[in-house]
């Protein structure tokens, strides 16, 4: 059985970041049960696609680190008005990407890797612009790593292919729930 857990990794990252910050509102951060399940499925897809456990772990770790850092910045009020507009745009693009991924998963023969890859690339670019003055170049590299990995047309084609049907179903279930709850 796989011992990797995105939830425990997220909690470790939260603790590390929060140990350097003050304020209780920062304590309620990123990961809930549904998000954890989606991240775990993304990990499994990455591991099967790349045939590399360390590479799959690295991309999910990078995703969690970036998400926690952006959440901390947002909750700490570090974003100015123009950056809050970028944050709204990022959330809209991410939501659009999730709805597109769901649509491709639910309606046969509609999948187009270029469309989903394009949406993920747009998300990456908006997020990089948002955190440009707040995070280090190392964090910018993590953002590029995560979005470049998941916008890879080969990975997307495999995900929507017959070998990954079970993973895609679980990811779509999680995305649907996150959208319904307004968390995406």
Swiss-Prot record:
Major site of localization recorded for this protein: cytoplasm
Oligomeric form and interacting partners: May interact with CASP8; however, such result is unclear since could not reproduce the interaction with CASP8. Interacts with RAC1.
Family assignment from sequence similarity: Belongs to the TNFAIP8 family. TNFAIP8L2 subfamily.
Pfam family, one: DUF758
Name used for this protein in its record: Tumor necrosis factor alpha-induced protein 8-like protein 2
Keywords, in A-Z order: Cytoplasm, Immunity, Innate immunity, Lysosome, Nucleus, Phosphoprotein, Ubl conjugation
Its biological purpose: Acts as a negative regulator of innate and adaptive immunity by maintaining immune homeostasis. Plays a regulatory role in the Toll-like signaling pathway by determining the strength of LPS-induced signaling and gene expression. Inhibits TCR-mediated T-cell activation and negatively regulate T-cell function to prevent hyperresponsiveness. Also inhibits autolysosome formation via negatively modulating MTOR activation by interacting with RAC1 and promoting the disassociation of the RAC1-MTOR complex.
PTM annotation (Phosphoserine): residues: 3
InterPro entries, alphabetized: TNFAIP8-like (IPR008477), TNFAIP8_sf (IPR038355)
Record bears the keyword Cytoplasm: yes
Naturally occurring in which organism (per UniProt): Oryctolagus cuniculus
UniProt GO BP: innate immune response; negative regulation of inflammatory response; negative regulation of T cell activation; regulation of apoptotic process; T cell activation
Comment, domains: The central region was initially thought to constitute a DED (death effector) domain. However, 3D-structure data reveal a previously uncharacterized fold that is different from the predicted fold of a DED (death effector) domain. It consists of a large, hydrophobic central cavity that is poised for cofactor binding.
Subcellular location: Cytoplasm; Nucleus; Lysosome
Post-translational modification: Phosphorylated by TAK1/MAP3K7; this phosphorylation triggers association with BTRC and subsequent ubiquitination and degradation. Ubiquitinated in a BTRC-depdent manner; leading to degradation mediated through the proteasome pathway.
Presence of keyword Transmembrane: no
One annotated Gene Ontology cellular component of this protein: lysosome
């Amino acid at each position: 059985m796989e011992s990797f857990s995105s939830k425990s990794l997220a909690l470790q990252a939260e603790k590390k970041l929060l140990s350097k910050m003050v304020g209780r509102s920062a304590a309620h951060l990123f990961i809930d049960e549904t998000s954890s399940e989606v991240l775990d499925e993304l990990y499994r897809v990455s591991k099967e696609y790349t045939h590399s456990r360390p590479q799959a772990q690295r991309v999910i770790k990078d995703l969690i680190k970036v998400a926690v850092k952006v959440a901390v910045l947002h909750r700490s009020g570090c974003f100015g008005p123009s950056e809050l507009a970028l944050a709204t745009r990022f959330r809209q693009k991410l939501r659009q990407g999730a709805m597109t991924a769901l649509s491709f998963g639910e309606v046969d023969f509609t999948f187009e890797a270029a469309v989903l890859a394009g949406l993920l690339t747009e998300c990456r670019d908006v997020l990089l612009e948002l955190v440009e003055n707040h995070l280090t170049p190392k964090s910018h590299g993590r953002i590029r790593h995560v979005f470049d990995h998941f916008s890879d047309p080969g990975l997307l084609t495999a995900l929507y292919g017959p070998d990954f049907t079970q993973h895609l179903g679980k990811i779509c279930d999680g995305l649907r729930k996150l959208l319904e709850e307004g968390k995406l």
